[in-house]
Amino acid sequence: MAIDEDTVSRIESLRRLRSSLNDMEGSQVTLLGDVMLDRYHHGYANNLNSIAPVPVLKIFQTDESPGAAAHIARGLNSIGLDVDFHTFVGNDREGKAIVDMLTEDGIAVTGIESVSDRHTLVKIRFFGSRESLLEESQILLQADRGPLEQIDNSMSDKLANNAMKQLENSCALVISDYDNGAVTVASATKLIGVARKNAIPVIMDP
């Protein structure tokens, strides 16, 4: 499966974090950030549309995975770190899918707030190649689906206050901001202040 630039950047962030925390396996990390569902459609693009010069994608496979801060949570968990994860999802199928996949990975989801009447952000990527001609597919289109309005800052305040409860027991604070409302300047400043007071390393993934 082709890897886009956002995923490469997140992988590099995890590698740097693993290097920093290499001797702290089994420790807890506090993570605050935005989440989204990454959906990948794979298919063959053999023909052009009859009314516009765009490829017609014949989809044969669809994959989904937790993205953004949820992707970081999975990476931290995979290197032996307990993740105290704080974020929010919409009360919809996509939000439930994120929570279910994190639960299957053994990541605690008690810090994930479900927001009624709100859609979870979904990044939909379409990959295609010419059948029997190209082995490597390429991205043809990305479509983003989610809420049009920003969530109230009170949600970020709530997440930060919840994260504060276990922060002193963590070996690091990770903040992953995708400008979707889980992180604000005020909430990040509050958490970073407590982390510095307790000599806890802070890693930002803006």
Question: Model segments located where?
Answer:
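Gly/Ser/Thr-rich active-site loops/lids in small-molecule metabolic enzymes
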Residues: 52-58
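Ribokinase/PfkB-type carbohydrate-kinase core domain
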Residues: 1-46, 58-206
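Flexible glycine/proline-rich, aromatic-decorated loop/lid segments
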Residues: 47-51
